[in-house]
Design a protein with these regions (language model features):
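Class I S-adenosyl-L-methionine
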Residues: 1-166
Length: 166
């Protein structure tokens, strides 16, 4: 299977994950609450169906929060938390970026990553990280800022996978 097929698969049931919302019913058969999400349902002419929370209406966001307990974590918070994990692993701060908590932003470091004695980039890539925040994608990959919807340039991304690829 391809990457997208793998991402859509529920590894517990062996089936694809399902929509778990009625928000997409207007698109017809295969988009109701219990329908499995297929590659064709979200690609080609359907590629704009799934959108970041920040691009949805405020009414939709509020409704999903109230009715489905949907929450999101601002990108700057994800960054701060991942930086704490990296501080522990590297034994120092500001390895991948320099945070500005006052402005809720960060600036990527530009120098090559210096690994602690006895550790290599391979050790970092192989190091286990666990994302336990109910599927918060920004902790893994940060394509866009979750609060503004603005695209994050590749060199500024803060997710765990982003860092390992860097």
């Amino acid at each position: 299977p391809g990457v997208l097929e793998e991402l859509l698969r529920d590894h517990t049931t062996g089936k694809n994950i399902f929509w778990a919302t009625n928000d997409y019913e207007e698109f017809g058969k295969g988009y109701d609450f219990f329908s499995q999400i297929t590659v064709s349902a979200i690609t080609d002419e359907n590629e704009r169906i799934v959108r970041p929370r920040v691009l949805k209406s405020k009414e939709n966001q509020t409704g999903r929060s109230k009715n489905m307990a949907e929450v999101f974590t601002p990108s700057w918070v994800c960054n701060a938390q991942i930086n704490l994990v990296d501080h522990s692993w590297f034994g120092r701060k500001e390895v991948f970026n320099i945070e500005s908590l006052d402005s809720r932003s960060w600036e990527a470091t530009t120098v090559p990553i210096n690994f602690p004695e006895g550790k290599t980039w391979k050790d970092y890539v192989r190091s286990t990280r666990i994302e336990i925040t109910c599927g918060e994608a920004p902790y893994l990959v940060s394509r866009y800022d979750t609060t503004t919807g603005n695209y994050i340039p590749l060199h500024q991304r803060i997710g765990m996978l982003d860092r390992k690829l860097r």
